[in-house]
Each structure stands twice: as structure tokens, then as C-alpha cells.
Amino acid sequence: EAAALVHDIGIHVSEKKYGSSQGRYQEIEGPSEARSLLARIPGFSSEEVDRICFLVGHHHTYSDIQGMDYQILVEADFLVNIYEDRLSSDAVRHVREKIFRTRTGRELLDAMYGSNPWEMACPDDCCHGGC
């Protein structure tokens, strides 16, 4: 759960340092930011901090996903990023086939995006316009 909360912690540093929040920069800058934050919060063992920092440093790396925590974090991040990045239907199908491994992740992906991610119900006063 802690990894889910801090996984994007490197975005602001990446934007300042590289002028970009691309995943590879988040993976570079995020772990030290996460470690610094977690050091100020009691209750985490050194092993937990190491694992959280590993996840923060790899959450945009989709090959060799090891551990259910890693898999769930990647899938949850994709569920949001598909919408934010307006991935095409083909891209969503590819991600489902190649990345999503958990039954719950696939069920959520299908429920949220179906066969066409842009046919989602959207209120008339949608803040994004043109949904």
C-alpha cells in the first residue's frame, strides 16, 4: 500500500531536473525521494523501505515483474494512465494481453475501458471536454 501512495514521488524532481516526468526519470529520482519520506515515518522495517523503493524505481519497467506487489502496482498505474494518456483501443488490448496478469486487474480494465476505452460514460459537464 505504501508503494502505491509514493510510486510517483519522483515526478516533481524529474520535471525540475530533466524537464520531463517520463517514467524513466521517475524511476531514477523516485527511490531516493521515497526513502527520504519513509525515513520520517515510523513503523517501516529496512526491508519494507528497500522493497518500496525498489517498486518506486521500477514501476514503469514491465519486463521481469517479480512479486504480486509489483504486478498490482503496475496494473493499478496502467488503469489510471490509460485514461490520462488516452491510449488507443489497440494499445489497451496490447497492455491487457502483455502486462495484466491478475484476474482483478483484468476485470477492472474490462469494466473501465471495455473494447473501446473512449466509450466510457461521461457526464455532460465533463471537466475534460469532448469525452
What are the residue ranges of the model-derived segments?
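An active-site-proximal "capping" alpha-helix that borders the catalytic cofactor pocket
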Residues: 24-41
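Acidic/histidine metal-binding catalytic segments
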Residues: 2, 41-56, 69
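His-Asp-centered metal-binding catalytic motifs of divalent-metal-dependent phosphohydrolases/nucleases
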Residues: 1-19, 30, 53-60, 77
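Generic helix-packing signal
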Residues: 7-8, 34, 38, 80
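Amphipathic alpha-helical interaction segments
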Residues: 12-16, 41, 45, 63
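Divalent metal-dependent phosphate-bond-processing catalytic cores, especially two-metal-ion Mg2+/Mn2+ enzymes
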Residues: 6, 59-131
